[in-house]
A protein has these predicted regions:
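N-terminal anchoring/stem segment of glycosyltransferases
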Residues: 1-64, 77-81
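General N-terminal targeting signals
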Residues: 22, 53, 69-70, 104, ...
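Cell wall/extracellular polymer interaction/catalysis modules
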Residues: 51-57, 121-135
Length: 140
């Protein structure tokens, strides 16, 4: 079993990487091989061997979100031998053990999770339209 995990952190968001990495190594599907693909404009000198830097510019908000899948296509050849590709937000820290069967479902090719800010009704998620697209002309 091998997991490819992406981290997105340009400018100050790269500061989340050390604790993010430590917690994923410790708590997220322990004892499973993980390779981290870090999309950043920052310096990763001295990083562990299981971190691969994916150089990107700081696009700024909201362009960063719009460029995510375009940038992820650069991983296609690098992750073809992995069992799963997972993206974990830079500011989302794993708090306790997450076992394989609790997170992955072999019967499904794709999956998504609800961001904690939505689940906890943090602004703007607690008011219409929240974070969901409500534009009737949208194909999202």
């Amino acid at each position: 079993m091998k997991l490819a995990i992406t981290f997105w952190g340009t400018q100050k968001y790269i500061e989340f990487l050390p604790e993010w990495y430590e917690r994923l190594e410790k708590y997220f599907v322990p004892n499973v091989e993980k390779q981290y693909f870090v999309f950043t404009d920052g310096d990763l000198e001295g990083s562990p061997d299981n971190i691969t830097k994916m150089e990107i510019p700081h696009y700024g908000f909201p362009t960063t979100y719009h460029k995510t899948f375009e940038e992820m296509l650069k991983l296609q050849d690098k992750v073809s031998d992995f069992d799963w590709l997972v993206t974990v937000d830079a500011d989302l820290y794993v708090q306790q053990n997450v076992e394989y069967g609790e997170f992955f479902d072999e019967s499904k090719k794709y999956f998504g999770v609800q961001h904690p800010c939505q689940y906890l009704d943090f602004p703007p998620h607690n008011e219409y339209p929240g974070s969901f697209d409500v534009n009737p002309a949208s194909n999202a």
